[in-house]
Amino acid sequence: MEFGSFLVSLGTSFVIFVILMLLFTWLSRKSGNAPIYYPNRILKGLEPWEGTSLTRNPFAWMREALTSSEQDVVNLSGVDTAVHFVFLSTVLGIFACSSLLLLPTLLPLAATDNNIKNTKNATDTTSKGTFSQLDNLSMANITKKSSRLWAFLGAVYWISLVTYFFLWKAYKHVSSLRAQALMSADVKPEQFAILVRDMPAPPDGQTQKEFIDSYFREIYPETFYRSLVATENSKVNKIWEKLEGYKKKLARAEAILAATNNRPTNKTGFCGLVGKQVDSIEYYTELINESVAKLETEQKAVLAEKQQTAAVVFFTTRVAAASAAQSLHCQMVDKWTVTEAPEPRQLLWQNLNIKLFSRIIRQYFIYFFVAVTILFYMIPIAFVSAITTLKNLQRIIPFIKPVVEITAIRTVLESFLPQIALIVFLAMLPKLLLFLSKAEGIPSQSHAIRAASGKYFYFSVFNVFIGVTLAGTLFNTVKDIAKNPKLDMIINLLATSLPKSATFFLTYVALKFFIGYGLELSRIIPLIIFHLKKKYLCKTEAEVKEAWYPGDLSYATRVPGDMLILTITFCYSVIAPLILIFGITYFGLGWLVLRNQALKVYVPSYESYGRMWPHIHQRILAALFLFQVVMFGYLGAKTFFYTALVIPLIITSLIFGYVCRQKFYGGFEHTALEVACRELKQSPDLEEIFRAYIPHSLSSHKPEEHEFKGAMSRYQDFNAIAGV
């Protein structure tokens, strides 16, 4: 990439962000757009603009975000969202403190050396001699065996020590945040329940429920309340979903009748396009009556004949449930497996009956499948990354050369084509990875999202960071490697590939924070979709609410996306220190934009009380470890005699991770008894707690109950039953 293309990419991205921010300032002030820009507040019964200022100042939202407290985030979006901001602020602190030393130290050292000038072939440059302006500010301009490399080694130590400090501080803070939430005096159903799996077959003459009740009543005679046995609900769920669909269509038909005074009709065939013409209200009322009868029949069959070897067990106190969840109940570990119960809306009922050894086999099979997929997915990503450089693109498609030679087109293509191709490829992954995570037999939605996030992180690191880094170089040198496949040549290739990809990643990070966060803040696409649906499709208030329901922060993709930027910034922070400015901007702007969205827009679909943090902590350490290994290799490629001094840092990272896990992780895996023993505001309604876990498809439904509950309730109900 040429220097002009880089500036065009950066400038264009910034201009787009400014335009989107101005659009947000203008559009968010209009009352008709409130459901798009303030849905969180609306769903909580608050006035959209309460506590805010309707001003033309485009930076007013920043002031509101900066003045908000962590408790505000917890109150409006939950502990998990607050923990995500701890992650953003921790990484921002790491990069800001690192830059205080690295930028004033490393940039002058690199700029005043002359390695690039003295190297005729310039094989070590960032972009093969076409980007010398930034090459001179990178480690590529440092002469081999130079004493200046001591400063770069010191920078590796500084970044590592800063990271250890901030991670330790953050882990303590998140642990405290989780404990405070769990000590809340409010009654939460999941704190009075445990999840029991791998139950043995009941003795003759006992049902599964009688067996589990007698088992736990014997162990906990004073605190056991009752149990809810898991059932095979696939058929009853389908009937329930059809019934809900008919209720929705009936409500829609009644709304049309009220608005037009004409009774709506529809055809009974495929998609309402063919078949007999009928009165919609009478037709859907009849279908509802039929479905209710089918549902009641299937409910009786499910409760009598389809009980499974899993259950939710309830206790009269929080401390009894917390104690039971961490106790070994059977001498054989594959029987009576007990864990803390997730929230009712999180349970993946279809996974509860999967046995322990089956879960282990599934887990390792899916790990193997994901590893193979990562390797094969690297092929198209590396290929596309290689051919989307204009030089390689002209070699493969010669007839585009006249078009590419037009300066304006060439600049735009160089600025955005490779980065957009990469983003498109990564967008295909999240649903597949979430499906695979659920297939492991994981019992809760939040756990499945954490598992999918981990898989996505490794996809990103291997396919984006490593794949893109090597793609262009391999594309040009594959013949040389085939002729002379020596280890030293491959190591040299790895070392020299890093600086050559620095400008690609600078542009990639800029594209992510300017355009990505600009679209996030402005919500242009959700706004357009909402108004189109409202005008042409929605007939009932419930349909309008469904059209603007915002969803949550999408941790399964957001966390690994942030982790990729973290990894890139880490690994290039010493090689090309300018990337620290981009990393600081990404996480700083991300903190501001997401703070606004958390307080006003997104609605959490679950609460795990910060259980994502150990996953985040581990991935940050993995990125730091990769950075240290990369610097060990690159300093070695610079033939620096004291490269081995990086090894103690690598060992320290492993020890630090182990110590943190031993000290903090137990409080995230289980609820500490000193936390669970705190008093409640009022005595818990145990029957209400029990009923919270009953799948909605097993609740009673009457024909006249065809009203919609609203977007929030419907979304939670669907999660509780389908587990999706």
Curated annotation (Swiss-Prot):
One Pfam family linked to the record: RSN1_7TM
Key words, A-Z: Calcium, Coiled coil, Ion channel, Ion transport, Membrane, Transmembrane, Transmembrane helix, Transport
Consequence the record notes for mutating G454S: In 1.1.ver mutant; promotes activation
Topology of the protein relative to the lipid bilayer: Multi-pass membrane protein
UniProt KW Coiled coil keyword: yes
One MF term in the entry's GO annotations: mechanosensitive monoatomic ion channel activity
GO cellular component: chloroplast envelope; nucleus; plant-type vacuole; plasma membrane; plasmodesma
Cell compartment(s), UniProt: Membrane
Spans through the membrane: 5-25, 86-108, 148-170, 359-385, 412-439, 449-472, 498-529, 555-574, 576-594, 613-636, 642-662
Coiled coil: 241-309
InterPro entries in the record: Csc1-like, CSC1/OSCA1-like_7TM, CSC1/OSCA1-like_cyt, Csc1/OSCA1-like_N
Extracellular side: 1-4, 109-147, 386-411, 473-497, 575, 637-641
Cytoplasmic side: 26-85, 171-358, 440-448, 530-554, 595-612, 663-724
PANTHER family according to UniProt: CSC1-LIKE PROTEIN ERD4, PROBABLE MEMBRANE PROTEIN DUF221-RELATED
Subunit and interaction comment: Homodimer.
Function (record text): Acts as a hyperosmolarity-gated non-selective cation channel that permeates Ca(2+) ions. Mechanosensitive ion channel that converts mechanical stimuli into a flow of ions: activated in response to membrane stretch. Not activated in response to membrane poke.
Family the UniProt entry places it in: Belongs to the CSC1 (TC 1.A.17) family.
Protein name in the entry: Hyperosmolality-gated Ca2+ permeable channel 3.1
Organism listed in the record: Arabidopsis thaliana (Mouse-ear cress)
